[in-house]
């Protein structure tokens, strides 16, 4: 339901952030600070307060969004958006169960013979799925053209997954996924794993950061047919601000404290180290 006011002291405004837009209103004469606070009240934890952002409004004269002029105040119906600045800044990379979602990409039977260390990334991927269930983190799973390439491998337990969806696009970011994300409040971080690193993982990660999400790629749970393709994809993605990490690092960051009520269960998952394959020496 839109937050609207019927009296003449308020002006209707369409607030947009990332892929979301919401109708609301502000008092006549509202300026920069009021508008920023309104964005925070509407989108809450979806806005990473540590990032640099710019406020823009839609100019009818120019037919596009422009930066908010100095001294701007709302006097009539308008459209505003908050845009993360694409700068070479180092993300803090903090993970929290309340603001995270796991993406499992195309871990299908047909890829088993071709993908390097496929058995190892299945094992690590299953650890991540188990950890997500313990911590109550939503999981979405894609399958690339399952009619021809088969379903997700049986070793991966998809019990409780929020969404398992087919795709033909290499990126996981398709309308079905975006609709599912819109139903999960406060998502800020995506933990991404699967195949292939230089194709579907890379294109998914780039689409996600373009939409304002923080992306963590699990290096010991992603691979390709070619180790060279994998290596250069991870290097490129790291330069764009995407975090390259490991499964154990992700799970322990999510519990954060030995006193966390789920720590023992997570500890049981990582008690036996992840497979020491050739993947990590080729990151």
Curated annotation (Swiss-Prot):
Pfam families reported in the protein's UniProt record: Isochorismatase (PF00857)
Family matches, as PANTHER family: HYDROLASE (PTHR14119), ISOCHORISMATASE DOMAIN-CONTAINING PROTEIN 1 (PTHR14119:SF17)
SUPFAM superfamilies named among the record's database cross-references: Isochorismatase-like hydrolases
Name of the protein: Isochorismatase domain-containing protein 1
InterPro entries: Isochorismatase-like_dom, Isochorismatase-like_sf, Isochorismatase_domain
Family membership noted in the UniProt record: Belongs to the isochorismatase family.
Annotated GO CC locations: cytoplasm
